[in-house]
Amino acid sequence: MAYYSTVLKRKVRKMLAVHFIAIGGIGMSGLARILQSKGYRVSGSDLKETELTKKLRAEGITVFIGHREENLASDVSLVVVSTAVSQDNPELLKAKRLGIPVMHRGELLARLMQEKKGIAVAGTHGKTTTSSMIAYVLEKEGFDPVIAVGGEIVDLGYNAKAGQGEYMVAEADESDGSFLKLLPYAAVITNIEADHLDYYQSFEEIKKAFKKFADNIRPEGFGVFCWDNLQVREMLKGYKKRKFTYGFSPGSDFMLRDYREEQNQLVANIYYKNTLEGELRLKVPGKHNILNAAAATAVLRNIGLSFKAISERLLEFNGAKRRFQILGERNGALIVDDYAHHPTEVEATLRAAKLYKDRDVLVVFQPHRYTRTHFFYKEFARVLVDAEKVVLTGIYSAGEKPIPGVSGEMIAEEMKKLGKNPLYLESLDEVYNYLEQNLKPGLLVLLLGAGNINQVGYKLLGKA
């Protein structure tokens, strides 16, 4: 690790060629784009062709499909990997054999952040939207930030950019502990809940990791923390660094009041230390997004933006891809895609769908990862019983090996115990055929999951 750090401290500009193994992920592709914009010759490989790999290729990045030794050119100066890359990957083995430095994507993100005033957004839920809000406002207000977030910002058309300004906005990924490599100027924690228990083993370990992340804020910087979340509140006991809290709860520094829904907009007044800042209005649905907007406001006010500028830009904001993204309409049915893959996220997205009072909601949920399904199948069932109609699919493995006895049917069986009778369709082809026969005016089809369930929506709309 020390050697990799030394290599990057010499300014990556001196290294002409960088190769990304598993370049097709949203985080890895973003870093690849940033390095390419900085003047590096970038290549990468992934297991399968996707819209993202096609885009990277169109942007001039060499992308190989499949992992093979010959994908790694002999003049490559640095290889970047994600946690998903196995130790027996042929490109990784070749890099080690040739003595080419290998760096985890989290380390690369940390090194890029050292060059800027980093704004890192962490949390079990809400980090993509919150970081996208901050990035969007800074970009539109002329700050030209470096951007590395976990979803394409709809209004900007990208999730990563090598800006020339003083700030860098990044999503801080806790799933593999790599967010602890970051030393941000400003950090946000939106919430702390149990997730990624395959990596952390216990909720206590997750809480310790978030505490360390908060402790890693630079001495001259500040933290922004959600006061509504009890685990965050517990973490802040004895916390010494400069901090600001936000939320609906009394005692929040940036406090939301008078939440309401008006003409397809979410509205709340926001106060700082009991003094009215003004009114926040959003087009993106879901009460949780007002909380995300409050976090963004707290960060942006503390780096000098006026509330007027912030509120006007947040009203323009149309969200990030796969975050309650309206894909289109067919046969009068509205098709919406959302990345929700944790019970709390599913619950929040179902609440957001209730804003469409004139539509019946049909939820199609694709569980993500065997481990997550194993740990949370009862919680998924509990939140899904509130939906009008539910279709469950097979598990999207995300590269995990199957766990005997763990399947999407576990959620279906648990829902039946709670009085709901969902439809279980193992394959996405079955889901597509079912939806094609059942689309009708007044229906809202909500495709939920962090896997490839959105491809069903695109196929229904003739976009696949």
From Swiss-Prot:
Pfam families, A to Z: Mur_ligase, Mur_ligase_C, Mur_ligase_M
Location(s) in or outside the cell: Cytoplasm
Signal peptide bounds: none
Keywords attached to this entry: ATP-binding, Cell cycle, Cell division, Cell shape, Cell wall biogenesis/degradation, Cytoplasm, Ligase, Nucleotide-binding, Peptidoglycan synthesis
Catalytic activity from the UniProt record: UDP-N-acetyl-alpha-D-muramate + L-alanine + ATP = UDP-N-acetyl-alpha-D-muramoyl-L-alanine + ADP + phosphate + H(+)
Annotated GO biological process: cell division; cell wall organization; peptidoglycan biosynthetic process; regulation of cell shape
GO CC, alphabetical: cytoplasm
Keyword Cytoplasm listed: yes
Annotated residues for binding of ATP: 123-129
Superkingdom per UniProt: Bacteria
InterPro entries the UniProt entry points to: Mur-like_cat_sf, Mur_ligase_C, Mur_ligase_C_dom_sf, Mur_ligase_cen, Mur_ligase_N, MurCDEF_pg_biosynth, UDP-N-AcMur_Ala_ligase_MurC
Pathway(s) this gene product operates in, as recorded in its UniProt entry: Cell wall biogenesis; peptidoglycan biosynthesis
GO molecular function: ATP binding; UDP-N-acetylmuramate-L-alanine ligase activity
Function: Cell wall formation.
HAMAP family per the UniProt record, alphabetical: MurC
Family note: Belongs to the MurCDEF family.
Name of the molecule in the record: UDP-N-acetylmuramate--L-alanine ligase
